[in-house]
Amino acid sequence: MAKAKAKPKQPVFLVVVDDSEEMHQALQFACGRARSVGGRVALMYCIVPAEFEYWAGVGELMREEAREEAEAKMAIHADYVKKLTNGTPILYVREGDIRDELLELIDKEHDISLLVLGADTQSETAGPLIAFLMAHGASRCRVPITVVPGNLTDEQLDALL
């Protein structure tokens, strides 16, 4: 008797959620790719730990506020992903250095198949995370990285997909 073929895994497109203007282009591109190939979008938000804590209670309060802010931002972007893909995104909230947390997440979550980042087109560099990945992190990243220029419109991105 022949073995049943294993169902191919759904590609997962990871977008780092931050306050940059170009994050929108990365999210738009990832949603378009997910829609066109039957994949999913994953969102990662990294909470930067407080530099110093005066008292344990103050530090805990700061951590709770940062978590609430992260969850609020993720909810907004998750709704956008649902609207564009008709699918629920995978959500990751991490705490620590964004570079380490990103690479650790990609290494741990084997369903992630592509990292999508938006590039700052208004300054000399594409952004600190892209600069890090191109200089040091690419050798540690097990998935391809797509860099989307931050000056593209939604219509231009949709035309590419």
Which role fits each region the language model picked out?
Residues 84-90:
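A short helix-to-beta-strand connector/capping loop
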Residues 3-57, 140:
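Small/aliphatic-rich secondary-structure junction motif
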Residues 1-3, 106-161:
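Gly/Ser-rich helix-loop-strand patches that form or flank binding pockets
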Residues 93-101:
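Charged docking surfaces used in two-component/phosphorelay signaling
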Residues 26, 53-56, 103-104, 127-128, ...:
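Short, well-ordered secondary-structure micro-motifs
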Residues 29, 65-77, 101:
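Short, solvent-exposed amphipathic alpha-helices that sit
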Residues 45-72, 155-161:
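Acidic, proline/glycine-rich short linear motifs
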Residues 42-44, 90-94, 146-148:
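General small-molecule cofactor/ligand-binding pocket signal
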